[in-house]
């Protein structure tokens, strides 16, 4: 349905209601009193300058003794497929969305507020196909652990992007966008996950894979959270929102990811690199890393892979240079940090930037997070007999050796950060730790690795005038 056809259908409903009012001999003022609203609202609706919401349509139809089912059927045929992408309560994009058999999910853009384009999602391409791709990226991924169990509680399947959107309204803890029917009157303040409690029951399903009937659930950030491992968002009363994340399962060398998160953030802290803080907790009998949400209602996280058309390490470095020294140095420091801890999973979805939701400006590098596949998390006991040899078998996702990456990005600042790691020792958790012999072996290897990386010559200048090293 085109925007013109949609407008014509709306006008048809309004005309029928206006005719019914006149036939009843009611003035706009009298009708307004009957339904508990202002005459100005009735006037604007009949002039076509105000959308007729579902709630108001039902009240007017009842007051005029019109068949509500006929009104609903007519409205449904025109409005059920029309959605709006909003930032807070500001509509950025209006589009239709419908399943078309073998063609699959199809969108048609009706109107885009191009004057506000600086506020649009950075990874949204303003084409019909681009809208569908953006929606598909926004919902829970098919490879997420317990995805079927999560969606089954809501009567949904993993391929039902529109159905998932209808339930969760596209709400997320990454940003402040949401996707709702075009005539939806609700306010963002009443629905967002930052300020409103979300389904604890669905969080348990997301984390344990076990849950009850769909009646127990409401919308949840689980429906728009990426990643493979078991995880769940929890609202901790008086403290904030936390992500609980488990480890891999099914083999003798799995399950160590939460430990790696806990210990890796200690290394980042020692180096003086901005990092999300992790703790460890047994929740529901399952070991989890626990970290506080680092976005808020005013600030969003944008993965670098959602910004760059070409996702290569060189493209990332070039882009960060355009953002300024702070951004570029943080990226270089992260890459050296990853080389130090042998992080094998620094893909283009788990690092990026923070954005001001109100202005659309990129304001800072995001803190480092998601270090679970590091510190030899998959190493078997035999591997620790010669950890240096095992370390040489580890690699990053870029198909470039850690050492070659460091040769490109090593600067005076990174050298100063590495020097802080000399004689580093982990702080043990009060109750949840890797075996002591494993920890001491990792500490020894970190010492060797620190010396190796410090031997790499500085290829670029990072020191400004009157700025001390380290």
Residue spans for each PLM region:
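A short, Lys/Arg-rich alpha-helix, primarily the initiator
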Residues: 1-23
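Phosphate/dinucleotide-binding and metal-coordinating scaffold of catalytic cores
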Residues: 75-336, 340-342, 354-470
């Amino acid at each position: 349905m085109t925007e013109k056809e949609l407008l014509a259908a709306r006008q048809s409903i309004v005309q029928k209601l206006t005719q019914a009012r006149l036939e009843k001999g009611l003035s706009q003022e009298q009708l307004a009193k009957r339904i508990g609203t202002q005459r100005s609202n009735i006037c604007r609706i009949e002039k076509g300058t105000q959308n007729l919401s579902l709630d108001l349509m039902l009240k007017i139809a009842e007051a005029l003794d019109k068949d509500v089912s006929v009104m609903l059927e007519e409205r449904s045929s025109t409005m059920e497929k029309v959605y709006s992408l909003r930032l807070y309560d500001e509509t950025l994009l209006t589009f239709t969305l419908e399943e078309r058999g073998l063609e699959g999910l199809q969108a048609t853009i009706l109107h885009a507020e191009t004057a506000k384009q600086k506020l649009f999602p950075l990874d949204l391409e303003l084409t019909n196909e681009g809208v569908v791709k953006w929606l598909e990226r926004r919902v829970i991924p098919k490879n997420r652990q317990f995805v079927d169990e999560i969606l089954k509680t809501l009567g949904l399947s993993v391929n039902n992007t529109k159905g998932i959107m209808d339930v969760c309204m596209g709400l997320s803890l990454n940003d402040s966008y949401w996707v709702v029917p075009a005539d939806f009157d609700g306010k963002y303040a009443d629905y967002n996950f930052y300020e409103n409690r979300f389904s604890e029951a669905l969080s348990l399903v997301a984390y344990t894979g076990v849950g009850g009937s769909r009646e127990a659930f409401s919308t949840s950030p689980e429906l728009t959270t990426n990643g493979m491992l078991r995880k769940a968002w929890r609202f901790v009363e008086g403290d904030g929102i936390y992500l609980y994340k488990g480890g891999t399962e099914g083999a003798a060398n799995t399950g160590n990811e939460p430990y790696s998160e806990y210990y890796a953030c200690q290394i980042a802290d020692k180096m003086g690199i901005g990092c999300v803080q992790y703790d460890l907790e047994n929740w529901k009998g399952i070991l989890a890393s626990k970290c506080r949400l680092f976005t808020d209602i005013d600030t969003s996280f944008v993965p670098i892979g959602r910004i760059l058309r070409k996702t290569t390490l060189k493209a990332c470095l070039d882009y960060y240079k355009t953002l300024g020294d702070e951004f570029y140095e943080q990226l270089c420091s992260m890459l050296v940090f990853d080389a130090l801890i042998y992080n094998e999973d620094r893909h283009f979805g788990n690092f990026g930037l923070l954005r001001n939701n109100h202005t659309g400006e990129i304001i800072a590098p995001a803190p480092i997070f998601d270090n679970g596949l590091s510190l030899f998390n998959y190493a078997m006991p035999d591997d620790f007999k010669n950890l240096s040899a095992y370390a040489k078998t580890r690699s990053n996702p870029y198909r470039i050796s850690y050492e070659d990456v460091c040769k490109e990005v090593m600067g005076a600042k990174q050298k100063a950060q590495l020097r802080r790691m000399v004689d580093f020792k982990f702080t043990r958790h009060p109750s949840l730790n890797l075996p002591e012999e494993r920890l001491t072996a990792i500490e020894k290897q970190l010492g060797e690795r620190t010396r190796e990386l410090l031997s790499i010559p500085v290829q670029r200048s990072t020191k400004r005038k009157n700025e001390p090293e380290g």
